[in-house]
Regions:
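Non-cytosolic beta-sheet module surface loops
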Residues: 18, 154-157, 167, 254
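Pseudouridine synthases involved in rRNA/tRNA modification
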Residues: 138-145, 166-276
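Short beta-strand micro-motifs in enzyme catalytic cores
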Residues: 88, 147-151, 235
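RNA pseudouridine synthases
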Residues: 1-145, 231, 246-247, 251-272
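Short histidine-centered loop motifs in beta-beta connectors
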Residues: 131, 151-153
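Short beta-strand segments enriched for Tyr within beta-sheet-rich domains
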Residues: 51, 159-168
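Surface-exposed loop and edge beta-strand positions of immunoglobulin-like domains
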Residues: 29, 154-156, 240
Length: 276
């Protein structure tokens, strides 16, 4: 189910999660359409206010930008900003020279056409830490030197489509299945090497068979079109419990289309759940 309004939006399922409470749980934040993984829900109004406050604190901090009086051009984050942490996994088409880890610091502007990179007036600060979890064998690379890689992405800010734009732009590692920002200048089935595309389509069909949807035109297909699905997953979320203050850590298993794609591309998933 999706956390945006529209096709099978998460709001349509909240009533089923009410159980013995007087009202359904409430959403604290959102995920982009077709992004899978962890989503925080609150059982009480008080919990929702506290949890939402974590995100609002981070947003206020982001709006402040960097401090030019600081010689390192960095500011100390308020303690409350550590109350929530989100790590995403993304399957990308990377260059062979992509560094093992780093930080993308690139302001974003939202327009009627989408989100674009634009420093200066009107731009909002946006920063993302990334780390390469696994790279495919060089034998799978394309003639242009592109190679599949699995990244851990940790947004420092929460801008709309931030991870997708940062990957496609400054990182030059478009997320597989991102036809809005990754492959916007080609047809919806283009932008990926032919052998990758055939492999990922086979994976998508295998996923449908495993989920009993073979040959179906489900709502997810209607949203994403004829190409492969978006390979972006909210892998882990950590936050302070709104009542006890204890640390809560939740890890969401990869959806079938991502785990099967990683297996087919030879991307190792060993070790912990990744962190940027």
């Amino acid at each position: 189910m999706r956390s945006v309004n529209g096709v099978k939006g998460v709001d349509a399922f909240l009533a089923d999660l009410r159980f013995d409470l007087a009202h359904p749980p409430m959403t604290v934040h959102r995920l982009d359409r077709d992004t899978t993984g962890c989503l925080i829900l609150a059982r009480t109004r008080e919990a929702q206010r506290t949890l939402a406050g974590y995100f609002q604190d981070r947003a206020r901090f982001a709006r402040g930008g960097s401090d030019p009086s600081n010689p390192t051009n960095a500011r100390e984050e308020p303690e409350s900003l550590g109350a929530v942490r989100r790590v995403y996994w993304a399957l990308v088409s990377a260059t062979s020279t992509l560094a093992s880890r780093g930080t993308i610091d690139a302001p974003l502007v939202t327009t009627h056409a989408g989100v674009t990179l634009k420093p200066g007036a009107g731009a909002k600060p946006a920063a993302t830490d990334y780390e390469v979890i696994s790279r495919a064998s060089p034998e799978i690379s394309t003639a242009a030197g592109r190679v599949p890689a699995l990244l851990a992405l940790e947004p420092r800010t929460g801008r709309k489509h931030q991870l997708r734009v940062h990957c496609a732009g400054p990182l030059d590692a478009a997320i597989v299945g991102d036809y809005k920002y990754g492959y916007r200048d080609v047809s919806r089935t283009g932008g990926i090497a032919d052998d990758w595309r055939r492999l990922l389509r086979d994976v998508d069909e295998r996923t449908r068979r495993l989920e009993g949807r073979a040959g179906s035109s489900d709502s997810a297909s209607e949203v994403r079109g004829p190409g492969v699905p978006l390979h972006l997953h909210a892998r882990r979320v950590e936050f302070a419990h709104p009542s006890s203050g204890g640390r809560v850590r939740v890890v969401a298993p990869l959806p079938s289309h991502m785990s099967l794609a990683c297996e087919a591309l030879g991307l190792a998933l060993d070790g912990d759940d990744g962190g940027a």
